[in-house]
């Protein structure tokens, strides 16, 4: 069992002021996997002061110094690979292969992308006799969700370090182990004291005072819309900059010239990947009437081949839902789909056979879903596909954009002109054509209620900078 009862503040592991702890539950076993410190306002105050004290010094470090720091982090991150994989499997229930090939790898990708972005990043630009300067914004508060313990953490931390902004970081209390390992990595490579501060705890005890602190100049949050809204309101009191990556209800448009087997495989993966606990999950599968029956046969077969189970068993592809609360929410949405008249094609309520222990859900397909139904409009955060039929391309695009969200979209087909038309028409911050995949140097963020700002690569670095113009600098 993992016991981490200290906070990491000003380059040291220190006792949490409250002396209280929180239990972390392994969702695959429903047993306690470890404990962490339950931080409070006093811990946040100490962390912010430490970050504020080092701000000017860190802001004025050279690009090369920060790039070298990121490179050292990359090397030590690789050294801790097995520790990170095991931690993520314990806290999230991610299958070992997913923990390695997705979670661990995405964290590494973001540190490398930020490091490499500094090669060409322009912090200064001459315009005639004048100078435009980009400089670190100052103390930044980071709050990350439970579904990607290294990805969401690394992309924010790497960007802040590259920009020269010290941080106070609150990971999710449900998946804090990987964040603690990152703190150990930073400590070993010598991240300057105060530049990185880790305060574990819950939203009320840590998240709220961090969002409200007058010395915090920027908040970067990934999570639910209601929490993002609450952070914005708190930040508005002293006009903090806010970067938000929130929910999604992403469309996956299948074109009538698509390879059926390839489309079914791609669409199924976008639903069951990470147990459906993905803000970019393509859960609204929008299929042309002309190929719908063939597609349904194929996608049902793909779902039947998915192995749900013990994340430590070889071959497991899908692990548990993160918690009892989240499991119950997924079950409620499945019940709602049935109640509203969608056709249950595969899966349904309850747990897969033989998986009584752990928060395992059945991968589920609903057919004949109307886009106005609850399961088509609200983020479920579980492995649930809603198949919606369209008759022409304009209707497909209209359905895709008929949502309050705009985080991601997908299109699968053969004709390049049609693929391009659809990709440009989807109202979302990220669109993938034929499973192209998102590279870590591309901007990531949402339209509409899916967020504010952009992350990843040089766009992520920009979020942690202020822009200053100096007139007459070269006179």
Curated annotation (Swiss-Prot):
Residues binding NAD(+): 201-207
Top-level taxon of the source organism: Bacteria
SUPFAM superfamilies found in the cross-reference section: ALDH-like (SSF53720)
Reactions mediated catalytically: an aldehyde + NAD(+) + H2O = a carboxylate + NADH + 2 H(+)
Location of the active site: 245, 279
EC code: 1.2.1.3
Keywords: NAD, Oxidoreductase
GO molecular function: aldehyde dehydrogenase (NAD+) activity
InterPro entries membership: Ald_DH/histidinol_DH, Ald_DH_C, Ald_DH_CS_CYS, Ald_DH_CS_GLU, Ald_DH_N, Aldehyde_DH_dom
Family affiliation: Belongs to the aldehyde dehydrogenase family.
Record-given protein name: Putative aldehyde dehydrogenase SSP0762
Phylogenetic placement of the source organism: Bacteria, Bacillati, Bacillota, Bacilli, Bacillales
């Amino acid at each position: 069992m993992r016991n981490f009862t200290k906070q990491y503040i000003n380059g040291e592991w220190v006792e949490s002021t409250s002396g209280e702890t929180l239990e972390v539950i392994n969702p695959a076993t429903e047993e306690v996997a470890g404990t962490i410190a339950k931080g409070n306002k006093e811990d946040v105050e100490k962390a912010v002061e430490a970050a504020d004290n080092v701000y000017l010094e860190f802001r004025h470090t050279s690009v090369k110094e920060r790039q070298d720091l990121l490179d050292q982090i990359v090397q030590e991150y690789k050294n801790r690979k097995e520790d990170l994989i095991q931690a993520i499997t314990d806290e999230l229930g991610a299958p070992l292969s997913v923990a390695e090939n997705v979670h661990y790898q995405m964290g590494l990708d973001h540190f490398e992308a930020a490091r490499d972005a500094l090669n060409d990043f322009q912090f200064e630009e001459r315009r005639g006799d004048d100078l435009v300067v980009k400089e670190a914004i100052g103390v930044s508060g980071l709050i990350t969700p439970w579904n990607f313990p290294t990805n969401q953490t690394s992309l924010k931390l790497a960007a802040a370090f590259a920009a020269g902004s010290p941080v106070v970081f609150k990971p999710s209390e449900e998946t804090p182990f990987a964040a603690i390992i990152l703190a150990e990595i930073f400590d070993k490579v010598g991240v300057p004291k105060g530049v990185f501060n880790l305060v574990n705890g819950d939203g009320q005890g840590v998240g709220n005072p961090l969002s409200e602190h007058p010395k915090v100049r920027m908040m970067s949050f990934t999570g639910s819309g209601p929490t993002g809204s609450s952070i914005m309101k708190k930040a508005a009191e002293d006009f903090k900059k806010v970067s938000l990556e929130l929910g999604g209800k992403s469309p996956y448009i299948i074109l009538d010239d698509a390879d059926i087997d390839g489309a079914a495989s791609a669409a199924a993966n976008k639903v069951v990947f990470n147990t459906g606990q993905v803000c970019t999950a393509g859960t609204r599968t929008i299929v042309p009437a002309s190929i719908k029956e063939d597609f349904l046969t194929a996608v049902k077969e793909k779902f039947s081949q998915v192995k749900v189970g013990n994340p430590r068993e070889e071959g497991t592809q899908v692990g548990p839902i993160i918690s009892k609360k989240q499991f119950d929410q997924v079950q409620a949405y499945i019940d709602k789909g049935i109640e509203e008249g969608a056709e249950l094609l595969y899966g349904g309520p309850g747990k897969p056979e033989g998986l009584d222990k752990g928060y395992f859900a059945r991968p589920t397909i609903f057919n004949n879903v109307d886009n106005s139904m609850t399961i088509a409009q609200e983020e479920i955060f579980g492995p649930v596909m809603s198949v919606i039929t369209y008759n022409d391309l304009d209707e497909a695009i209209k359905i895709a954009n008929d949502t309050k969200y705009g985080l991601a979209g997908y299109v699968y087909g053969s004709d390049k002109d049609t693929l391009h038309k659809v990709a440009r028409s989807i109202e979302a911050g990220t669109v993938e054509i034929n499973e192209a995949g998102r590279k870590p140097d591309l901007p990531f963020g949402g339209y509409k209620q899916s967020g504010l700002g952009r992350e990843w690569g040089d766009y992520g670095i920009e979020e942690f900078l202020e822009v200053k113009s100096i007139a007459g600098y070269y006179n």
